[in-house]
Curated annotation (Swiss-Prot):
Leader peptide range in chain numbering: none
Keywords, sorted A to Z: Iron, Manganese, Metal-binding, Oxidoreductase
GO molecular function: metal ion binding; superoxide dismutase activity
Family stated for the protein in its record: Belongs to the iron/manganese superoxide dismutase family.
Entry protein name: Superoxide dismutase [Mn/Fe]
Keyword Metal-binding: yes
Reactions mediated catalytically: 2 superoxide + 2 H(+) = H2O2 + O2
E.C. number(s) listed in UniProt: 1.15.1.1
The UniProt record lists the keyword DNA repair: no
Length: 145
């Protein structure tokens, strides 16, 4: 459970700053477009003078946007399709929770724990530092904390 102050800080300060800074970087190179998922999927193609700003702030925006999208005031159950995929990948839901908790609590400093679909179409748990996004590693995030 999250407290109100933490959510306000992350939404109104952190996320808003990531959006503003990503937009400022994109304004310097309108020719590359504004699709952050496409841009962050090929970081080396981002112009060098804005690359780190987009990795940090574009990643921060995408990470937080997914977090807000998945947040719910009500407890929800895992769908049968997701439960089956988790069982296949991790052996059980408990094993998945253990792996996800380890990814979240073993990250030194700031970062994210993720449930992603990897390049082979399989679920995996991973962690990224700061505002790095799994998209830059060719993985599709489906849960982030």
């Amino acid at each position: 459970q999250f407290d109100k102050e933490t959510m306000i800080l992350h939404h109104d300060k952190h996320h808003a700053t990531y959006v503003a800074n990503a937009n400022a970087a994109l304004e310097k190179h309108p020719e590359i477009g504004e699709n952050l998922e496409e841009l962050l999927a090929d970081v080396s193609a981002i112009p060098e003078d804005i690359r780190q700003a987009l990795v940090n702030n574009g990643g921060g925006h995408l990470n937080h946007a997914l977090f807000w999208e998945l947040l719910s005031p009500e407890k929800t159950e895992v769908t049968s399709d997701v439960a089956s995929a988790i069982d296949e990948a991790f052996g059980s839901f408990e094993s998945f929770k253990d792996a996800f908790t380890t990814a979240a609590t073993s990250r030194f400093g700031s970062g994210w724990a993720w449930l992603v679909v990897n390049k082979e179409g399989k679920l995996e748990v991973m962690s990224t530092a700061n505002q790095d996004t799994p998209i830059s590693e060719g993985k599709q995030p489906i849960l982030g904390l």
